[in-house]
Structure formats: C-alpha cells, structure tokens
Design a protein with these regions (language model features):
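Short, conserved, GDST-rich strand-edge loop motifs in beta-rich repeat architectures
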Residues: 138-158, 296
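Short loop/turn segments immediately following the C-termini of beta-strands
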Residues: 55, 96, 141-142, 200, ...
Length: 308
C-alpha cells in the first residue's frame, strides 16, 4: 500500500546543505510495490502521470499523480528498460527483450526507431536521452541477452557494448562512443557540451566532450567512481549537479567538479531516477520491487527537450 517511509539524507560535503539539495520536511514516499525489477521512470507533464518499467514482468506501468492509482500502460512491452520523452512528448522506450528502441505515437501506435547497427541486431538497448536537436542517443549493453530473466538469451551480433546516435532527419543509427564494458545511464550536461555515461561493469561514470555538431570528440575521462556498488541511471538538476542511481548505495549527488556531496538512502537497490511533478522538484526512484518519490530542495531540467 502507498505510504510514507522515513528517509535519510547523508551529507558528505557542506555544499549538499548550502545548495539546499535536501528538503528537511520531505519524506520518502512509497508509491507502489509489486514489481520484480523496476526501471525507467519518466514523467509525462501533459497527463500528470508517470510511466515506468517492470522488466521481468514484461510490462510498462502507469502511476497517476492526481489519484495515486496504478495501472498497466502496456503489456507485453518487449521487456522494457529505460524510457524518456522526445520534444513532442512522445514516449521513447528501450525494449531490451525485443533488442530495439521504439517511440509510442500519440495515437498509441509504436514506431521502431532503431533495431540494428550496420545490419546487425542491437544487443539490448538500456537507456536513452534526447538532445535538443532531436537526435536520440542510447546505450546498448548486453545485459538483456545474457539470460532469460530480463530478455532472451542470445549471442551478441555486434560483439561490443556501445552508445549510439539516431539522426533526427534520416533515422540513421551511428556509433557515438565505444570502449565501454557495460554502458548504462546517459545524460547530457545542461549546455550539451558533455555526455555523461555510467559504465556499470567498470563501476564509474565517464564524461566525453561533444562538439557543436553533436559529435563526441574524445574518449572521455572518469568523472566519478562508485564505491560499494555500481552506477545505473544518471540525471542532472538545474544547478548542474549530477544525481546517480547507485545500486547498493541509494542515490548519489555530485557537484560539477566530481565531488560526492551527499546521498539519499533508500531501503532497496536503486536502478533509476527521474525529476518530475508540476514543479520538477519531485524525484521518482525506481528501486528493486517498488516505486518511491521524494520532494527535494532542487529542481530538474524541463520535462521535454528544448531546442537550443
């Protein structure tokens, strides 16, 4: 049943307090329990609801902000993982079971955005982000093809775990960045000059430079390493701080200089996070078996990509 749980902010640097990252009177609220592995929350402002994934149960769920009710958004859903919105407010989903990235149109139909690279099937797309130019970037580890639990066991046709870009005009899938062991969450800096990618198998977040044309220009450097767990999804707030779902360590908050400022401690393994709500100050947390939320003292970026 939905309710409130005590939450704990762990302050590791005084900037976590002075930056008002934590809201002292907020609670960690349990919105739903009953998933087998929750992932990919995305807030849909036009309808005031949240869609998220229950990967092993092969379904997308929907939580209504006004009523608190939960229902099935789509099932089967291709063992969905990460979700995001494009500039038109359409749902973009990484279907790791179907080994593809799709877009749900406003009429409910599903369009395949990417399922192959140079004629070879993708591994199991994990997470996606949309740049302001309309391009869709996604990570493609092999997590969904190593067993039948969250997808379908298969051999990798590509033979590597990469990050790809889908051109908004042509739909062409190109290699954006490589050299990862297990690329997972990805997000652009607020000015879109840097791309941050969590590598779950390497237990770190890598940051890469991006030029004016939207091309990655280097191999990147390590932004932060995860101690006592591994990174999954990552998000920025409006102040340029990076928030990371750290499996085994709650939610970590990093200063732009890479300093770990503090943590939100959650009573389950955390896989994915998303800012949402009318004021964009509510963090939704997809954990192992449940969906949580907490109101923070900071806000997230606009819900939809803004053309620069």
């Amino acid at each position: 049943m939905p309710g409130h749980h005590p939450h704990l902010y762990e302050t590791l640097d005084d900037r976590f307090r002075t930056g008002k990252c934590a809201s002292g009177d907020s609670k960690l609220e349990l919105l739903y329990d009953g998933t087998r592995w929750a992932e990919g929350p995305v807030y849909v402002p036009a309808g005031r609801y949240l869609v998220w994934s229950d990967i092993p149960n092969d379904r997308l769920l929907r939580w209504d902000e006004t009523t608190g009710s939960v229902g099935v958004f789509r099932s089967p859903a291709g063992h969905p993982n990460g979700n995001t919105l494009d500039a038109q407010g359409r749902l973009v989903t990484c279907e790791q079971g179907n080994r593809r990235v799709t877009r749900t149109e406003h009429d409910g139909s599903v369009t395949v955005i990417a399922d192959r690279y140079r004629g070879k099937r993708l591994n199991s797309p994990n997470d996606a982000t949309v740049r302001s130019d309309g391009s869709i970037w996604f990570s493609d580890p092999d997590f969904g093809i190593t067993s039948d639990y969250e997808g379908h066991r298969a051999d990798s046709e590509i033979g590597a775990c990469n990050v790809y870009r889908v051109d908004p005009s042509t739909g062409e899938v190109t290699l954006a960045a490589d050299g990862f062991l297990g690329p997972n969450g990805l997000v652009f800096s607020l000015d879109e000059r840097r791309l941050y990618v969590s590598d779950s198998r390497a237990n770190h977040i890598r940051v890469l430079d991006v030029d004016d044309d939207g091309a990655v220009t280097d191999d990147g450097e390590i932004f932060a390493a995860c101690v006592g767990g591994t990174f999954d999804n990552i998000r920025f707030d409006d102040g340029g701080r990076l928030w990371a779902a750290a499996m085994g360590g709650g939610v970590h908050c990093y200063d732009p200089d890479g300093t770990l400022l503090g943590r939100i401690l959650v009573p389950e393994i955390v896989a994915n996070i998303r800012f949402g709500g009318a004021k964009r100050n509510r963090m939704f947390i997809a954990a192992d078996t449940a969906l949580y939320s907490v109101v923070l003292g900071v806000t997230g970026p606009p819900h939809l990509p803004v053309r620069r």
